[in-house]
């Protein structure tokens, strides 16, 4: 069954761009240096194209993407494994509960500053991204495993279906919707947390470093341009990951029904 589209509507984007443009014009009219307070969409777009024409732009984008998505993938792997363990053993869930509560309640900035004591700025974004992604993925996958159809599991036990077949034929199809929901939430969180780690840790050659430099030199158009890059990369990889999950789910459905 297809889900109702929740994509951003073009008219809504245009509306907020107009609001942004009007606000920038009002500030320029009210203050001599109003452009320093809020760059216009046109200025940001021009600056974005200028940055995209440099090799340093692509190196920074690749650097941040590799570190932030690396942390995301590491967290997903660990969260799925520990969720499966917690679903099987109650003590494992009880053991992890305080850790999950701490991660969810402590501010990201506190984790970043503490992590800088132990880690270099180059690996900081990986660690922080993984740390922030872990709780939602763990919680969703654990919920998905626990909501697996008990009648199917009973049938698998009666017919002595191997564990591998139970995982691919029962657990995965019923857990994927929960994992998909977690990915939608976690990808946005990891980009925000990872970029914050780069800004505070001044990770060399990263988007976060460019944001910090733009702030120090009052380059408002650069600040907005790099922010737009983060938004675009986050949206792009969310679409790619969700597409991959959907394709995987369709392939499993085909395997289950022997479709060609």
Language model features by range: what are they?
Residues 117, 145, 192-230, 253-259:
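Glycine-rich helix-loop "coupling/hinge" segments at transmembrane-helix boundaries
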């Amino acid at each position: 069954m297809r889900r109702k589209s929740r994509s951003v509507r073009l008219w809504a984007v245009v509306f907020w761009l107009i609001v942004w443009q009007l606000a920038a014009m009002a500030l320029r009219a009210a203050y001599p240096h109003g452009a320093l307070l809020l760059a216009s969409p046109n200025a940001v777009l021009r600056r974005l194209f200028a940055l995209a024409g440099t090799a340093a732009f692509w190196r920074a984008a690749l650097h941040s993407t590799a570190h932030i998505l690396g942390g995301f993938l590491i967290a997903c792997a660990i969260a799925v494994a520990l969720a499966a363990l917690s679903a099987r053993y109650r003590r494992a869930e009880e053991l992890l509960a305080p850790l999950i509560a701490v991660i969810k309640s402590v501010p990201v900035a506190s984790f970043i500053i503490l992590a800088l004591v132990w880690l270099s700025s180059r690996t900081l974004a990986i660690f922080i991204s993984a740390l922030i992604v872990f709780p939602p993925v763990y919680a969703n996958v654990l919920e998905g495993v626990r909501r697996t159809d008990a009648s199917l599991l009973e049938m698998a036990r009666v017919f002595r279906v191997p564990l591998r077949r139970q995982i691919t034929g029962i657990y995965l199809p019923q857990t994927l919707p929960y994992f998909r929901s977690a990915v939608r939430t976690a990808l946005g969180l990891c980009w925000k947390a990872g970029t914050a780690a780069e800004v505070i840790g001044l990770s060399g050659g990263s988007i976060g470093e460019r944001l910090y430099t733009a702030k120090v030199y009052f380059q408002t158009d650069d600040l907005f341009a790099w922010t737009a890059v983060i938004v675009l990369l986050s949206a792009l990889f969310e679409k790619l990951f969700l597409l991959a999950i959907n394709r995987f789910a369709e392939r499993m459905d085909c395997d289950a029904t022997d479709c060609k």
